[in-house]
Design a protein with these regions (language model features):
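Secretory targeting and sorting signals
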Residues: 1-29
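Divalent cation-coordinating acidic motifs and surrounding scaffolds
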Residues: 276, 280-610
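A broad structural signal for short, well-ordered beta-strand segments within beta-sheet-rich domains
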Residues: 24, 131, 202, 414-415, ...
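Short, functionally important structural connectors and interaction interfaces within domains
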Residues: 7, 12-14, 33, 255, ...
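Secondary-structure junction/capping motif
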Residues: 3, 34-40, 364-368, 548-549
Length: 610
């Protein structure tokens, strides 16, 4: 331990700001004036027993400093822990402005104990115990840091979280922590403490916010390409952990990593919690990325007698996007999807994107995309879509996202039946015993409350080698508003699922109406369902054996089209009627696992012999 450092001008400024007080002695003092230590104010539940109370001269060592963002401050850890594994020895000290302490300082902190809910209490997140309105006394500098707690398979339980207390609205906040039993209890018992991971596999690629995800339990549900598959509400992947850096990116660029890469060496820093991923290792020291060599996939070309039907969410595409985005998306269609016969697109925006001036037409968006496909060596697709009523289909304000069909007229024809518009519902009729759409393209039940502020399904009738095929393109309601997996209420409240369940009922009912007219009708339902193959909405689509979800034809390790918070998961689906058998099906991984993406979704294709 060193003698106190010369504080000089830094302390003068900090004194003026009320963030720091002059040392009272020349040696590090680990005794609290009022007897309160960090583990006392943290307590053995998720809520501090001292919340709202003032504390005086809480001692500890500074283990991390955050000088950027809206949550500036530092982490304080007591080098003399108690014997209770449920009580954290670390705490965040919120200073509001850039703190002037340094890592390794021995300090005492006086202030108010608070519980901060990232994103606001209504968001459902757990709280972070903090000391606010602090007065900080630097006692000495250059002290050794408390040894990090190593997070690995042996330390982190497979079980994720206990069920909440029914008497408290299923809240877990007041439950005694059981860090040996549940991963979220372990992480909470380490909140604010110095932790370490070593040689960890990346399961969520570096994002635009300089974050990535690793797993400290690589044996849990591995994907075929190095990720971690989310396959059940009851079986969470407890080893997922978000990594951020305490070093501003202007000083040290954040590493670029793809799924399957390894963050080699040690990554160490305080364990934080935020609304963008829950428990987060805020690294003082970052490991080095070792590439796994992940490459974008390419599917095979359809055979002459195979109808290739694909779906691709192109993430808010509009003409103002850089040409490079159009070119990359086009390469996805031509090179990686092998130019399918029909492509259902989601998130096509209107001709001026997010400019909210009443524009709803998207012909410029679609034609620019088709031109890019031709330039990439693909066919000059034709397109069909229906412009929505302005501002009624959700998505980015002003963008008026909708689904659209691209089709290769050299291989497949579209059966046009006029009259389809934003508000006219399509219905099923019989044409000499064959199911036919009243309008094509048409929208399913656009006036139903299930589709309020959401994209209406787009139905179209195609013909391939003389055989009619009805295709329904979907983009169900988003998961916005759902509580996070780390929510303080368990089981997690998935409020958005109600809307998607209603939408599934609508689509399933429409398909069954088709089959009531023609039992062996050829029907493809596809798109961004925004829900999992095991979800209530996903299962409801298949009710009555009206459809088969092709995701279930894949091995569990291959079932994903999207990566979120380190979970590789199914959001995009292709479902087919029983008359189409079991098509050759491929989710083509070109985006979701990569730091450099053309879209946040992977496309997929089914090759069908009608």
């Amino acid at each position: 331990m060193t003698t106190p450092r010369s504080i000089g001008a830094i302390v003068t400024a900090a004194l003026a700001a009320g963030l720091i007080a002059m040392p009272q002695s020349a040696t590090a003092d680990t005794s609290a004036a009022d007897g309160v230590r960090v583990h006392d104010l943290q307590g053995a539940t998720r809520l501090s027993p001292l919340a709202g109370q003032a504390v005086t001269a809480v001692p500890g060592i500074v283990t991390g400093v955050r000088t950027y963002g809206s949550s500036k401050g530092f982490w304080l850890q007591d080098p003399t822990p108690d014997a209770d594994p449920a009580t954290s020895e670390g705490v965040f000290v919120f200073t509001s402005s850039a703190p002037t302490v340094a890592v390794g300082d021995s300090v005492t902190v006086s202030g108010t104990v608070s519980e901060f809910y990232p994103g606001g209490k209504a968001a459902g997140d757990q709280s972070v115990t903090e000391i606010t309105k602090p007065v900080v006394t630097v006692v000495s500098s250059g002290n050794a840091l408390p040894a990090p707690v190593v997070l690995n398979s042996a330390a982190v339980p497979a079980a994720y979280v206990p069920a909440g207390d029914p008497a408290a609205g299923n809240s877990i906040e007041a439950l005694p922590l059981r860090p040996a039993a549940y991963a979220l209890d372990l992480y909470e018992s380490l909140e604010g403490m110095n932790v370490q991971v070593a040689d960890t596999r990346v399961v969520g690629a570096t994002d635009p916010y300089s974050e990535l995800w690793v797993t400290v339990r690589p044996e849990d549900n591995p994907s075929a390409r190095g990720g971690t598959v989310y396959g059940s509400y009851a079986n969470q992947n407890s080893g997922r952990l978000q990594i951020q850096s305490l070093v501003p990116t202007a000083q040290q660029p954040f590493p670029t990593a793809n799924v399957g890469d390894v963050l080699t060496g040690t990554t160490e820093g305080p364990l934080d919690y935020n609304q963008f991923g829950g428990y987060t290792l805020t690294a003082r020291t970052l490991g080095t990325v070792a590439s796994h060599g992940l490459q974008p996939e390419t599917t095979r070309k359809q055979r002459k007698d195979e109808l290739a039907v694909a779906t691709y969410n192109v993430e808010n595409l509009d003409p103002s996007d850089p040409q490079a985005k159009f070119d990359r998306l086009a390469a996805g269609v031509v090179t990686h999807l092998a130019s399918p016969d029909i492509v259902a697109l989601e998130e096509i925006q209107d001709n001026n994107g997010a400019v909210n001036d009443g524009t709803v037409a998207a012909d410029q968006t679609l034609n620019k995309f088709i031109d890019a496909i031709v330039a990439a060596g693909g066919p000059r697709y034709q397109w069909r879509s229906i412009d929505p009523t302005n501002g009624t289909d959700g998505g980015e304000p002003g963008g008026n996202i909708r689904q659209a069909f691209l089709f290769n007229a050299a291989r497949v024809s579209f059966t046009d039946r006029p009259g389809g518009d934003a508000t006219t519902p399509v219905w099923v009729s019989s044409n000499h015993g064959r199911a036919a759409l009243s309008v094509s393209p048409g929208r399913i039940a656009p006036g139903d409350s299930a589709w309020a502020d959401s994209r209406k399904p787009l139905a179209g009738e195609f013909s391939f080698r003389g055989k009619p095929v009805i295709v329904i393109a979907n983009h169900f309601a988003s998961k916005g508003g759902d509580a996070p997996l780390t929510s303080r209420v368990q089981p997690v409240v998935r409020s958005s699922e109600t809307k998607r369940l209603q939408q599934s009922v609508q689509v399933n009912t429409f398909v069954r109406q088709i089959q009531a007219v023609q039992k062996d009708a050829r029907v493809v339902v596809l798109g961004d369902i925004n829900d999992y193959e095991f979800s209530a909405a996903g299962l409801r689509l298949t009710e009555g054996r009206a459809l088969k979800d092709l995701a279930l034809s894949l091995r569990p390790s291959e079932r994903y089209s999207y990566v979120y918070q380190g979970n590789s998961q199914v959001l995009d689906h292709i479902l087919v009627s029983p008359s189409l058998g079991t098509p050759d099906y491929d989710v083509v991984h070109i985006n979701a696992e990569f730091a450099d993406q053309a879209s946040d979704h992977d496309p997929q294709v089914a090759r069908i012999r009608p």
